Amino acid sequence: HSYGKSAVRELKDMVRACHSQGIEVVLEMPFVPGISANYVTECLRFYMLEYHVDGFVLNPYNVPWEQLIEDPFLKDIKLMQKDDGFQNVMRRFLKGDENMVNDVIWALKNRSSENGKCNYITTQTGFTLWDLVSYDCKHNEENGEKNLDGPDYNYSWNCGAEGPSRKRAVVNLRKNQVKNALELLLTAQGTPCLLAGDEFCNSQRGNNNAYCQDNETGWVNWT
C-alpha cells in the first residue's frame, strides 16, 4: 500500500535506503497454480532489474526452478521456496499436541548442506504470533466473506480464553508461549523470519486474512 502519489518511487527509495544500511530486500511472489514459466521468469526479471531487489520467496507449486536458476539475469540472486513444515510442527508442539518431540528435534536440526533455509512460525498470511496464542478459531467476519476466507487449520491455542482477556493467568501464559515460540525460532538451524509486529505482540483481533483491512486491524502501529 502506498501513502504517496508514486508507489514505484516509494518502493525504489525503500530498497535504496535498506541497501545503504546493509539490509537485503527479498520479495514474496505468490504465483497462482497454472501460470506460465515464462511469465514467472519475466516478473522476477522485472523486479530485479527495475527495483534491484536481492531475491524472492516463491510458493512450491508450479514454479520453474530450473529455468530460474539457469536464467542469466537471475542466476546470482537468492531464490527461496516457502515451506510451512517448520511452522506447523512448532505450532503443534506449542499447543501441546502429542508425539511431537521427535518432529521438533528434526525441524530444529534440519538444514540442507547445499541450500539455505528460512524458518518462520507466523507470516503475513495467517495469525500474528499474539493471535496464535489468543484464538482457537479465526475471526474474519469483518472481511465480508462470512468468515469463509483464510486458513481453517491454524494449530493455535487461546490459553484458556478466546480473544482479549484480563485474567492474569491467561495473559502470563500467552506471554510465556510467545517467548517459547521465539526461542524455538531463533535457535533452529537456518535463518529466522519474524513477522513485523510480533516483537511487541501485535494483534489483528483474530483475523488471519487481513489483506483487505486497510485500518487498525491490518496496520502495524509502531508507536
Regions found by a protein language model. Give the residues of each.
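Residues that flank catalytic or metal-binding motifs in active/ligand-binding sites
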Residues: 1, 116, 216
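Conserved alpha/beta catalytic core and glycan-binding cleft of carbohydrate-active enzymes
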Residues: 52, 61-196, 200, 209-213
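Substrate-binding cleft of carbohydrate-active enzyme catalytic domains
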Residues: 1-51, 58
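Repeat-unit-sized solenoid/scaffold elements
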Residues: 42-46, 51, 78, 82, ...
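Short, function-defining helix-loop hinge/capping sites that tune catalysis or transport
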Residues: 30, 36, 139, 206-207
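Extended hydrophobic/aromatic segments used for targeting, binding, or gating
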Residues: 204-223
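Active-site-proximal loop/turn and secondary-structure-junction residues that shape catalytic pockets
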Residues: 29-33, 62, 200-202
